[in-house]
């Protein structure tokens, strides 16, 4: 049976939960920290001048981080299995185009917003049509190309029906921007990693050039120029390069974890995808399996360290949210508070690093690079005139990377606890990310509408708080459904 790094699966599952959950919570009535900070309630109009981040602004970077970590984990297994450079790049481009297509299909096949039972049935048919396109067996063999071609024809037929019946606009601009960006990031990140897999100095040079490119293009305000041109923005976005500042360090994390695998794990089967599952095992003997007082003390220490890291990440997010609030008022200036927070971080991070090195030696290097980029990002914050998602700032990429890596370490303890329902749901959904991303919209929601359950749920959860609970429950149900597919070794892979 294949060995896995459950903390990476769980982190990916959490990011998917966050993306879907934040998209379906009640709009305009919740506190500002429940939304993108630049889309505040009640109107949610984009305010590019607003700096700061909330937890919602973190879910996509975490997704990118998981993808970056997984690229070396799967790539090194493929290389060890004898794949040539030609085969690697052929697979890389195939997956890029399949992901690019998925960015359009997951939007164009979703007719659940239309009224009537037929629209819901067509949406469910769209979910089924994605199987011949993206289904992969547990042994990594993709569906034969004739069946994949049939899936393409079925998807095109459903899109044509939707356009005729409901007047859907079919254009190059109608796609999921998240999957669209991930496709390009996977292409660039996968290529850069392969070419620099044994030459970290070259990867560092590419990273430095990307950093310079980001500084220059943002100074010249090129992101706004390219996005304003509809002939360019459907295929090109500056963030395709900016987010590499997050993804490339994540590939180094993947290299660190890959090099720490046990010999038996080096032959793990690779059918990883974007976002990929990671063929890597948690420690063979978990803390919870040890016996005696020493084992119990270790469990207590690991649990305490995991909690401290989670609280530290929470504080960092709260700090970067609070100091940029319009109603922020404190005795010290914002710059003074940022400096004070940096000093506190410089004191706390080494202590947490010592604990990580003692309890989880495998993650020693991961913690070091996480701390480095987190501090670097906080230092860049004032230089960027505040951390921002739009336009994507350097501090946003670096802080997001640091928090993502720390969360991966903290979840290592959670993943070692004896399997529980929530762990199975998040890890199961995390191993099947493409399906998880669309399961609520084109599987669960149409069923709820067909049966009248959605109308009933909306009636009994009219208050904002109840609406949040409803959103969380429905996303968990959709992820649970996907986890059942994963347990049956039914995966969607580009």
Question: What residue spans do the PLM features occupy?
Answer:
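Alpha-helical transmembrane segments and their immediate juxtamembrane cytosolic regions
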Residues: 1-267, 285-494
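Long, intrinsically disordered low-complexity tandem-repeat segments
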Residues: 266-286
